[in-house]
Amino acid sequence: YVRPVSSWKVAVFEHQVIPPKTDMETREEALDALKLNSDVYHEAVLESRSKGVKMIVFPEYGLYDINTLTRTRMDLMAEKVPHPKHGHRNPCDEPEYQTQSSEMLRTFSCMAKENDMYMVVNMAGREPCRRATEPECPGDKQLLYNTNVAFNNEGDVVARYYKTHLFWEEGWFNSSKNYEMALWDTPIGKFGTFMCFDFQAVQLIEQYNVRHIAYPASWVNLPPIYQSIQSHSAFARFAKINLLAASVHRLETSTYGSGIYSPNGAEIFYFRPDIPKSKLLVAEILPIHVKKPEQTVVNFDNPVFPSEDDDVQDLFDRGDFAFLKYKRMTTRAGTVEVCQKSFCCKARYAVKDRFKEVYAVGVYDGLLSAGANNLYFQICTVIQCPHKKCGLKISKVRTHFKYLNLRADGWLDRYVFPSYTVMYNNYIALDPFVWNYTEAGGIETKPGTSTPLHSANLVARIYAKDSSKHVHQSHPIDEGVIKMAVKYMLYVMAAYVYAAS
């Protein structure tokens, strides 16, 4: 039995990974590398405890340097993580976990127990497999998974989650074929966890009526529309949940941005591309009581595959959103509408004084390529166009909007995520108190407000129209994975050069 509470103090930790000092060829060397970062986690837990925190979430890929990963090295770092459905497990107390092969699992279990704190940690999990009976079983006869592990405040493993949609991780991880929510009880209510491109779990949130999500992430920002704090706050607002989003802090790959979000907006967030260090965020969350919806859950087992005629835009080849169809806003006040196919985006607006930069209404209805997946998006946006080119990174905002109403017609699904992003002193920020959102009326700013608008966005993910590229997994790394890694590094280099310019 978990005694309910009226509020709960929680934390997320945005961590800048400490790379290993030497190459990893043994389990001992792998543990040395892991401990460099788990020691920092311990410091964050101690600081959190001093602030009254009852639960902390750590980021995806927070324990190891992604730039040095191979299947062999991940094998050295992986541990077998128990599933709670197979019985009670407390690695801190139980003798079978007092071995080198379970050292990190035991470390985190004891960390949670000794500090009376719930914890969610991302690590490498392993499962043995048989090639004779399991077609997906690699040559090394084991499945390595990108894994979230949740511990309660007594150190028990209360949830385990394997990642389904890999994001250029096929060189070291396997994709889980069993999509399921990992759920556990806390004093504030039931929690769930997932990560990164497994972000379609809004349907499962509604199926299980979960109102609190722990979300470890390694979020690569794609300005100006698909950045971490925009997407995470939009998800929390639409799904009516508390979202604890912890991203790794890796500036060279534009990977950063964490926060604690509620149905009312951001309780606290951190989005600083200019500060190369870790950050602890603490806030209080409240219980959320929402009646379970009656809508039918989308079936993920039967995706709609694109035809050869479909124009699939590759987000990471492009690195921008210039492929949207845009229509410029030319008068101080008015209405602008732009359509693609049968999907139309419409903005009614008024600016203070005059436009000091170019703004436009943009629309997109189609597939976007990301990693091993084609993801179907509908996008309706009002956005600044730096140097008169829309869809590029925005560095400064001087135009203030006195009024904005953004809505769209032709949605293919009701899962529409709203965000309203402003820019103060050249830094992107969230201001949840200046706007409202309803499914019928879209985004509308409140009377008497004037904001330096970065972008207002309505983004729908049409999960039933997603498709897989069917990337083949093998061991050792095959040519396709090498090509993907090269492609990713080219994107990283381009993003770094662009950010520095």
Swiss-Prot record:
Residues 20-287 form the CN hydrolase domain. InterPro entries: Biotinidase/VNN, C-N_Hydrolase, C-N_Hydrolase_sf, Vanin_C. Keywords: Hydrolase, Luminescence, Photoprotein, Potassium, Sodium. The modification S-(coelenterazin-3a-yl)cysteine is found at C390. It comes from the Eukaryota. The active site is at E60 (proton acceptor), K163 (proton donor), C196 (nucleophile). GO terms for molecular function: hydrolase activity. One of its GO terms (biological process) is bioluminescence. SUPFAM superfamilies: Carbon-nitrogen hydrolase (SSF56317). Gene3D superfamilies: Carbon-nitrogen hydrolase. Its EC number is 3.5.-.-. Photogenic gland (at protein level). Monovalent ion-dependent bioluminescence photoprotein. Displays an emission peak at 470 nm (blue light). Trace amounts of monovalent ion trigger the intramolecular oxidation of the chromophore, didehydrocoelenterazine, with the emission of light. Belongs to the carbon-nitrogen hydrolase superfamily. BTD/VNN family. On the 2D-gel the determined MW of this protein is: 60 kDa. This is Symplectin.
